[in-house]
Amino acid sequence: MEIKLNKYIDHTLLKPEATKQDIINLCNQAIQYDFATVCVNTCWTSFCKELLKNSNVGITNVVGFPLGACLTEVKVFEVKKAIENGCDEIDMVLNIGALKDKDYDLVLNDMKEVKKAANDHVVKVILENCLLTREEIIKACELAVEAGLEFVKTSTGFNKSGANIEDIKLMSKVVKNKAQVKAAGGVRTYDDAIAMINAGASRLGTSGSVEIMLKQENKSNY
């Protein structure tokens, strides 16, 4: 049975030079394909809310993005403003330096405070796997589960590399049924998307969403 990819996809536009017209195009595409969410920076939340008001498409906002190095209080403020402006899901970046320092209390508290501010909204934590060792990825996943987060996510897409199959399998194994896995960064093709899902991802962050859907439609027509 063919996987319906559209509801796996957070249709993503996070580049700093994004214009209003770019965001309009993003939202129109999301409506056309009925994607799970659009993933945008918080300055666009209200604008997207209006554009998407008659659709089933949600809004994901990034927080502490892309470095994760701001104060927890700043992340909490971002979350509260994002939700106030209409966002549905939060993708936060964890404090990577603190994880490497083994300051697990700080990392855990950072995630817990964001989740507390988000309340019943879905929170995904971005690990930025390309900067982490295997052991650090495992520990970050364990802390995310302890913090009560719904997803662990591979990458911001702003660093040296993004999602890979080995990391998705590892993250899925660690979180088991206690959280889900989002693959992001470098998920550009239909084959990438299917491979990530087969490895254990239940959400995909990609700016190549339309190309992926067109490829699926072409396959369905044969």
From Swiss-Prot:
Localization in the cell: Cytoplasm
Metabolic or biological pathway: Carbohydrate degradation; 2-deoxy-D-ribose 1-phosphate degradation; D-glyceraldehyde 3-phosphate and acetaldehyde from 2-deoxy-alpha-D-ribose 1-phosphate: step 2/2
GO molecular function, one term: deoxyribose-phosphate aldolase activity
Listed SUPFAM superfamilies: Aldolase
GO BP term, example: 2-deoxyribose 1-phosphate catabolic process
EC numbers: 4.1.2.4
Disulfide bond annotation, renumbered to this chain: none
Principal localisation: cytoplasm
InterPro entries: Aldolase_TIM, DeoC, DeoC/FbaB/LacD_aldolase, DeoC_typeI
Record function comment: Catalyzes a reversible aldol reaction between acetaldehyde and D-glyceraldehyde 3-phosphate to generate 2-deoxy-D-ribose 5-phosphate.
PANTHER family found in the cross-reference section: DEOXYRIBOSE-PHOSPHATE ALDOLASE
Protein name: Deoxyribose-phosphate aldolase
Organism of derivation: Mycoplasma capricolum subsp. capricolum (strain California kid / ATCC 27343 / NCTC 10154)
Lineage: Bacteria, Bacillati, Mycoplasmatota, Mollicutes, Mycoplasmataceae
